[in-house]
Amino acid sequence: MKFDETFILPFVQKHLGDQAGAEIRKTWQEGMKPIPSGGSFEEKYEVAYANWIWLAKNIYPFIRKRMGEDGLKKFERAEVEALKRKNGGPALFILKLVRAFSVSTAFTMTAKQMGYLFQWLTPFSVPELTRRKAVLNIPQCKILDFPDTEDICRVGCYSTYPMWVAEQFMVDMKCNRQGHSCTITLTPSA
């Protein structure tokens, strides 16, 4: 959540002003629950996850209402750039070197890393992982179990994350949603 807060608030303040920043911060605080210090790992995770859902599901309509669909596209572009900054570094440099010698090896490494990065979002299985394709099967998306989360799916899963992995990791990401289940297919970019 620190990533979301450190990226979202500056975006809102830059494009909408300090008053809008205070307004979204107030909205977030109204829905956030404290993480129980004496709770189990699972309890802490569930509260933190619900807090992230609250943060994410409120920012998209907030931006859309004040900036329109073009503003939402600007926000999405800024989020992609923030993800690229967060996930850059020496490992990405090494991945680029590997890709120069073997696209399929680099893809396999990236697909495994994407699986690791996405595991906190929702439970899934990986029924297929080859040097040219990875399939992530989500039988019941945890995000969509919460009310008013269509934008997280539509903007985040269908647009922001695919742009990010294409630009930073040279991987195409396609989502195929059926109700609350989804199949994500990763392939090396051409």
Which residues are covered by each model-predicted region?
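N-terminal accessory segment detector
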Residues: M1-K133, Q140-G156, M173-C182, S189-A190
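Mixed-charge, glycine-accented linear interaction segment located at domain edges/termini
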Residues: T160-W164
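Conserved glycine-/histidine-rich ATP-lid loop and adjacent helix of the Bergerat-fold HATPase_c
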Residues: E167-Q168
